[in-house]
Regions:
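Alpha-helical transmembrane segments of multi-pass membrane proteins
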Residues: 1-243
Length: 243
């Protein structure tokens, strides 16, 4: 594997670890709320609206707006600044991790997860999966679907491309749920401050991104173009096989 691509796969797996860590931390520490996504929160808005629990509804609407603001910023920032959005995203993750450990246990669970509602969608929209795959680092449903279909197609057709695809999605799922498992263990032993161990993979991600930038700068343009073309051809192959 080309060194540049190796770093990008490692970045993806590291971010999946962080996504799983923050995801389960939110669930076990804040009333079973999953801060990485909005589905449950939006259903809560509907429930509170019909049940006329307007105070809780407003808190959930606040979480929705924060989530949307993060998505908007990932579009707006590249149009106005030349900074690497990946560093900004990891910086937001680090700040969110620091904040979460200081929030008291008695505060509103929704408000306590506002940093997660901002950091996770920012990460989701910033980092694209390597190798042309379609994979999120903050939740698992699509990753599980892709892994299952790839394994099924490999068993039926013995296609090596599907084997590679299954390995990628399998590693993504493993990274995500390893982070989730460690998050639970640290929460059980350290309480709310257990979130701070997630700073280790976050700073490791910073190092990986720096290494990826340096490698990309040292790689001749022709080599990068060839690698990109190879990825595009593989994507086309997947589309034909999955059509």
């Amino acid at each position: 594997m080309h060194t540049e691509m190796k770093y990008r796969f490692l970045i993806h797996y590291t971010l999946s670890f962080i996504g799983g860590y923050l995801g389960l931390y939110a669930i076990v520490s804040r009333a079973d709320l999953f801060g990485n996504a909005q589905t449950a929160n939006l259903l809560g808005v509907v429930r509170d609206l019909i049940g006329r629990n307007f105070s809780d509804m407003l808190l959930r609407v606040g979480a929705l707006l924060i989530y949307m603001a993060a998505v908007i910023l990932t579009v707006w920032i590249p149009e106005h600044f030349s900074a690497d959005l990946r560093f900004i995203s990891i910086g937001i993750d680090i700040f969110a991790i620091l904040l979460l450990g200081f929030f008291p246990s008695g505060m509103s669970p929704v408000v306590a997860l506002y940093p997660v509602f901002f950091a996770m969608p920012f990460q989701w929209c910033t980092f694209k999966a390597p190798g042309g795959y379609n994979s999120s680092t903050i939740f698992s449903t699509n990753n599980l679907r892709q892994f299952t279909t790839a394994v099924t197609q490999f068993l039926m057709k013995k296609d090596s491309a599907q084997c590679d695809k299954a390995k990628f999605y399998g590693m993504t799922l493993l990274s995500f749920h390893t982070g989730a498992a460690l998050s639970l263990i640290l929460y059980m032993t350290c309480g709310l401050s257990g979130i701070w161990l997630c700073l280790v993979p976050a700073f490791y991600a910073v190092w990986l991104i720096s290494a990826d930038r340096n490698t990309a700068a040292d790689t001749p343009a022709v080599t990068r173009s060839t690698a990109s073309n190879g990825s595009s051809l593989r994507n086309l192959s997947y589309k034909k096989k999955e059509a």
